[in-house]
Regions:
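Non-transmembrane alpha-helical segments in soluble domains
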Residues: 49-53, 74-77, 138, 142, ...
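Short secondary-structure junctions and interdomain/linker hinges
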Residues: 80-84, 96, 148, 200-208, ...
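A short, terminal or domain-edge coil/loop segment
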Residues: 63-76, 118-120, 204-219
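Short, basic/polar, glycine-containing "phosphate-handling" surface segments that engage DNA
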Residues: 124-126, 236-252
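GST-like fold's C-terminal all-alpha helical module
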Residues: 84-195, 202
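Generic secondary-structure microfeatures
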Residues: 168, 204, 260-262
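GST-like domain detector, emphasizing the conserved glutathione-binding G-site
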Residues: 3-110, 249-250, 254-260, 264-268, ...
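Catalytic cores of secreted or luminal carbohydrate-active enzymes
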Residues: 182-242
């Protein structure tokens, strides 16, 4: 993701909660990465990619042109995330990985999964299902989009955003030794998919070498840079015709609570509503330590829930 962002600087966060650097900005949302462009902070990888594609930069854009290509790109995004490929891939992590033996990591995963604990019996059911889903995903790509031997999904000269959307969960899990049983999922069974994964890895490695390395900075330095940069996005509006606006009589400047609806939903942000439309909600945080030094957080509407801050406790969702 850092390669795709072409970030000027980065501040690595711990793999488990807490993340005090984000908390100081008033952000309780627990999934990473997040992207800051000035004092605007973007949540969720899909929204981050959309924002980066909108920027006017010298580097060529990776997004598709034309309605048919854009449709393939979008469908691959849905395929990987909403279609369950990533979540199924995560269920195939080998149990002997050091991080999975760490009690702190195990406790954090329970929190991430909204309190659900997985028993040994659960895994005997889940793992065969997950193998089948990944095998089916590989077969789908092998026999359709990659069937004619093309290098890249959209027949481009280099990987496009469509390739990124489709390859990343498979690239991730295929690179973990012992995750995929070779009699079910392998380069022998799916040669075109594995060749695509290998091409993608080579392209990423080459891109990393050709780009300036982002500067590593401390959390305090990141916060200073963010708060002194000003906002990069223009002010939006709360769409009065949006069904959510009508249902809850939402108004700009009112406190709202925003949280993801799938995982990590116990970590909820509270902020003042700045704008809302069918694609995105923007709210301004007010950190406990310094209420006037917040940021404007952008979250996608898809996969997130928004409510008046004083009504959240009554929601059983």
């Amino acid at each position: 993701m850092i390669w795709y962002m072409r970030a000027n600087c980065k501040q690595l966060q711990p793999p488990i909660m807490p993340r005090p650097d984000l908390a100081k900005l008033g952000i309780n949302y627990r999934r990473i990465p997040v992207l800051s462009i000035g004092q605007d902070v973007y949540l969720d990888t899909r929204l981050i990619i959309q924002k980066l594609e909108q920027l006017e930069v010298s580097n060529p854009k990776l997004g598709a042109d034309g309605p048919e290509r854009k449709a393939i790109e979008k469908l691959l995004e849905i395929f990987a995330v909403d279609g369950g490929i990533f979540s199924r891939a995560a269920q195939l992590l080998p149990s002997d990985l050091p991080m999975l033996k760490d009690p702190a990591f195990g406790k954090d995963r329970i929190d991430f999964n909204n309190g659900r604990r997985w028993s040994r019996d659960d895994w005997t059911v889940v793992k065969p299902e997950a193998i089948n889903e990944i095998r089916n995903a590989m077969e789908f790509l092998e026999t359709t989009l990659l069937a004619d031997g093309r290098d890249w999904i959209l027949k481009t000269d280099q990987p496009s955003l469509a390739d990124i959307e489709g390859v990343w969960p498979l690239h991730w899990i295929a690179g973990i030794p012992g995750a995929l049983p070779p009699d079910q999922v392998s380069a022998e069974r799916f040669p075109k998919v594995y060749a695509w994964i290998n091409r993608f890895q080579k392209a990423v490695s080459a891109a990393k070498k050709s780009q300036p390395k982002p500067l590593d900075i401390s959390g305090d330095k990141a916060r200073e840079l963010i708060l002194n940069s000003g906002y990069s996005d223009p002010d939006g509006q709360v769409d009065p015709s949006d069904p959510l606006t009508r249902a809850h009589n939402l108004k700009r400047g009112e406190p709202v609570t925003v949280w993801p609806t799938d995982t990590g939903s116990s970590h909820r942000d509270v902020g003042l509503l700045v704008s809302l439309d069918g694609k995105e909600v923007v709210y301004e945080t007010q950190p406990d330590t310094s209420p006037k030094q917040g940021v404007r957080v952008h979250a996608p509407r898809h996969g997130f829930r928004i409510s008046h801050a004083d009504r959240v406790s009554s929601l059983k969702l």
